[in-house]
Amino acid sequence: MGETDEYCRPASLADLKALITSLNRQQVDYLLIGGYALFVHGYHRATTDIDVLVPATVESGTKVKSALMMLPDQAAKDLEPEWFAEGDNIRVADAFLVDVMLNAGGETYDTLKRYATTVDLEGIPVQTLSLEGLLRTKQTMRDKDVSGRHILERALNLVREHSGE
């Protein structure tokens, strides 16, 4: 962890639900990715942050900033919507970490939106990716991407076996 996030606690399910509710309320185009995306699909992988992939636009930055103002420490107040158009991922270190991703494993919101699916999380609609879409975000050689890729490949094989593909 970097020095800016050493004071953050791990994100909880309650944090995820509050964040997704706020993103939905602000009508943010987003896709939940990473460990919590696996969780909403029914697979468990240890994670400490919440990763959301958003379009790399100023408009998206404005909406995301508004949505993130629900975070307890209001760290999002320092975000500049113009940063989003630059395409670099943004880490918001508040009470818990939110990684606002503008690219993931070489993929963007626009290249992945065809894999978008909505999953119900205790009555909250969550915009995320299908398992195939999530696998596309795990094509790097980082240790956690390699392990995530193995989990996703096994899950996809199970789904295919059950559907007769």
Predicted regions and their residues:
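Compositionally biased terminal segments of proteins
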Residues: M1-E165
